[in-house]
Curated annotation (Swiss-Prot):
Alphabetized UniProt keyword annotations: Activator, DNA-binding, Transcription, Transcription regulation
Subunit structure: Heterodimer of a 70 kDa and a 82 kDa subunit. Part of the early transcription complex composed of ETF, RAP94, and the DNA-directed RNA polymerase.
Top-level lineage group: Viruses
Keyword Transcription regulation annotated: yes
Name under which the protein is recorded: Early transcription factor 82 kDa subunit
GO MF annotations, alphabetized: DNA binding
Organism: Rabbit fibroma virus (strain Kasza)
Lineage: Viruses, Varidnaviria, Bamfordvirae, Nucleocytoviricota, Pokkesviricetes
GO BP, sorted A to Z: positive regulation of DNA-templated transcription
Function: Acts with RNA polymerase to initiate transcription from early gene promoters. Is recruited by the RPO-associated protein of 94 kDa (RAP94) to form the early transcription complex, which also contains the core RNA polymerase. ETF heterodimer binds to early gene promoters.
Family designation: Belongs to the poxviridae VETF large subunit family.
């Protein structure tokens, strides 16, 4: 699906809201007579020939920034008021009535806002119409203002339009809604939903209605149901993904389409408690996941410490970048906002990350060059520039020559570098692997030993490409999301646990790995990014993947000891990472990645080596070997495809009132449950049927005199 950036409309009006100018803004530079904007313009305003401008209003702007942009666009310097016929912009009323400066205004009830355009105007991605009026032409001139345009916004817009025609906006989108509402469903509503699901598509959607408390699921066997615990309805799609679940009081919705199709004859009240949407956008053309911006763009994104994660300016939208896809998490649903932010990411990637990166390193500050080569007073690791080759030097490649005492590297600009250490130690020319991996830059430094065996040397001297996923030797502190080529330490408690007695050597004054025979660290998973937001998500992931996962200071194991696999995961900012072992030899650049010693943590599993019964009741038995019903393993896949609803046994007010004096003397962990059980057993023993026998007091006085206190 190709995303089309919608046109935008700016209407500049004078007194009486008479339209003075109509500006049709589009990055395509041509009028789209099939667009909703043009339909509105031609049908409602009777205008068919607007001014066409190859411009674009960024939907990430705040209202004050938008006013500055509009003043520049219209080339005006007087106070203005901006508004819209569809949404409130700069001003609004308490009751959210649409503000219009040409309509009678209750000034005292006006509320001014400086929010972000895409939040204030939710449909802006598809249909943006902004009205601009000179403040003096309205009855509320004192509410107008003038704003200077932010030149960085204009610079960004210019560069955006320069690359726009070459952008590949083909994308496929998967979405997951995480909405929690407070509802009035209760038991009756859940029953209706079960029946609707079975009627709608019982073969494809699996549903389960069960009764539970906070500790375990209560299967009732042949005993009477005590309804003091909550019910829960869960519905799965054909892929086993939860579409929605409800306990009657609240409901969590992931599949909005299915849920709304079930509500045609159910009177449902819903109050949003929490809501967010996660989009996964698959791109047709790969992008650079490490975005680096070289102009001010805080009006669009906030850069984070992790260079493949961006936040929106209001920090309510998070964006995770990968080579072939983008993950976007939005706090509240905004139509097509995921497509718009993907468009911005693709544009920025084209604007700032396709530049030639193999620039002449000699242009970089000398001080910085000395620092990255770790040059000191007694360590001469910064190469010097020489003017010519010695006669006795032999050619190794087109850009490298050597003799028995000297090596010379020639960069793409023809500048010759050599290592002439006065202490005669650092005489070998080599290259910094980190710069080559990240930027394809061959940065010469001086080394103690010959570097011709390294992959970076082969790439810079012999033009042999190295694997793009080579691990960066710098080990990050734990806590940040780890990108594909990087590794980080484990949390202190687990670092001590996994690496007890293991030796690791770092380069002096930094955390660059120099040598280790095997050290446990954290790396990103090779698979797609996987988020686990709740404990339920964690438990489901661990049992499905059948591997160990560490989240904060808790270790999660699969239910069955025999199922535990050989991988160990760790959760960082809701994203699944992997624990691995790295090995590195001091004389080599390559970092070897090995599986973790999973047995260290597997041995912590609280397993029972002997058969034991955990709990037994009513023919059901929970044991260390599984769940048994009447002595046989219970392995039936529970489902509510076939449902039978029975009438609840209720206890009349007369009965509970009669025994109330007795219950005052009852001391038990669950008094309500004791009372219900007592009353139900009394009804059964006396054969009381409320539908047939309404006068039960004489029976109670006969068999339970003195309110049951004496028998």
């Amino acid at each position: 699906m190709r995303y089309v950036v919608s046109p935008q409309l700016v209407l500049y009006v004078e007194k009486g809201q008479k339209i003075k100018r109509v500006l049709y803004l589009t990055p395509y530079g041509v009028l789209d007579d099939k667009s909703p904007i043009y339909y509105f313009l031609s049908t409602h305003l009777k205008i068919t020939d607007p001014e066409i401008h190859r411009r674009h209003i960024l939907l990430t702007l705040k209202i004050s920034q938008l006013k500055g942009y509009l003043c520049n666009l219209l080339d005006i310097r007087n106070d203005i008021i901006i508004y819209s016929h569809k949404n409130n912009l700069e001003y609004s009323y308490v009751d959210n009535t649409i503000f219009n400066p040409f309509v009678h205004t209750q000034k005292k009830t006006l509320i001014k806002s400086d929010g972000f355009l895409y939040n204030i105007y939710p449909g802006a991605c598809d249909f943006l119409v902004i009205w601009v009026a000179n403040a003096d032409d309205t009855s509320i001139a004192e509410f107008g203002s003038y704003e200077d345009v932010d030149v960085n916004i204009l610079k960004f817009e210019t560069r955006l339009l320069e690359v726009f025609d070459n952008l590949d906006l083909d994308m496929n989108i998967e979405s997951k809604f995480n909405n929690i509402f407070r509802t009035n469903l209760k038991f009756t509503g859940l029953r209706k939903l079960i029946k609707k699901i079975n009627e709608l598509n019982g073969l494809y959607y699996k549903s389960l209605l069960y009764k539970s408390d906070e500790y375990f699921i209560n299967l009732t066997g042949n005993k009477f149901i005590l309804t003091d615990e909550r019910l829960n309805l869960t519905v799965w799609d054909p892929d086993g993904v939860v579409t929605f679940s409800s306990d009657g009081d609240t409901i969590t919705i992931n599949n909005v389409k299915l849920f709304t199709s079930l509500l045609t004859d159910i009177d449902l009240q819903m109050e949003r408690i929490k809501g967010d949407v996660t989009y996964k956008i698959f791109l047709s053309t790969p992008i650079t996941s490490r975005i680096k911006l070289n102009i001010e763009t805080s009006f669009i994104f906030v850069e984070t410490a992790t260079n493949n994660i961006l936040l929106s300016a209001d920090k309510r939208i998070s964006i995770i970048l990968a080579k072939n896809h983008i993950s976007i998490k939005v706090k509240n649903y905004i139509p097509n906002i995921e497509k718009y932010f993907t468009f911005l990411v693709i544009a920025i990637n084209s604007m700032f990350n396709n530049i030639q990166q193999a620039s002449d390193f000699t242009k970089i500050e000398t001080v910085y060059w000395s620092r990255i080569c770790q040059n000191t007073k007694n360590k001469h690791r910064k190469p010097v520039i020489v003017s010519s080759l010695d006669d006795n030097m032999e050619k190794v490649s087109d850009n490298f020559y050597k003799s028995s005492t000297k090596e010379v590297f020639i960069n793409s600009s023809g500048i010759m570098f050599s290592c002439l250490d006065p202490l005669n130690k650092y005489n070998y020319v080599g290259f910094l692997s980190i710069f080559y991996r990240l930027q394809k830059m061959c940065i010469p430094c001086c080394f103690l030993k010959n570097q011709s065996h390294t992959e970076t040397f082969s790439s810079c001297v012999h033009q042999k490409e190295i694997t793009s996923d080579v691990i960066n030797p710098y080990i990050l502190n734990f806590g940040k999301v780890v990108t594909k080529s990087k590794i980080s330490f484990l949390p202190i408690i687990f670092d001590s646990f996994f690496n007890k007695g293991v030796k690791i050597i770092f380069e002096q004054d930094n955390k660059r790995l120099k040598e280790t025979i095997g050290y446990h660290v954290v790396k990103s998973c090779d698979e797609d990014i996987k988020r686990l937001r709740t404990i339920s998500d964690i438990i489901m992931f661990v049992n499905e993947d059948k591997n160990i996962l560490i989240a904060e200071d808790i270790i999660y194991f699969p239910m069955n000891y025999a199922d535990i696999g050989t991988r160990v995961y760790i959760l960082i900012q809701e994203i699944v990472h992997e624990v691995i072992v790295v090995k590195k030899h001091m004389t080599k650049d390559l970092i070897e990645v090995c599986p973790p010693n999973y047995k260290l943590v597997k041995n912590l599993f609280p397993r029972q080596t002997k058969f034991a019964t955990i709990r037994s009741d009513s023919g059901m038995e929970l044991t260390t070997d599984g769940f048994l019903v009447d002595g046989k393993e219970f392995n039936v896949d529970l489902s509510s495809n076939y449902v039978a609803f029975t009438k609840n046994i209720t206890t009349p007010y007369t009965l509970s009132k009669y025994f109330a004096p007795l219950f005052k003397y009852v001391i038990t962990e669950s008094k309500n449950r004791f009372m219900k059980t007592w009353l139900i057993n009394t009804m059964l023993r006396l054969g009381i049927d409320l539908d047939l026998d309404t006068n039960i007091l004489p029976k109670l006085e006969k068999y339970y005199p003195n309110h049951g206190k004496s028998v």
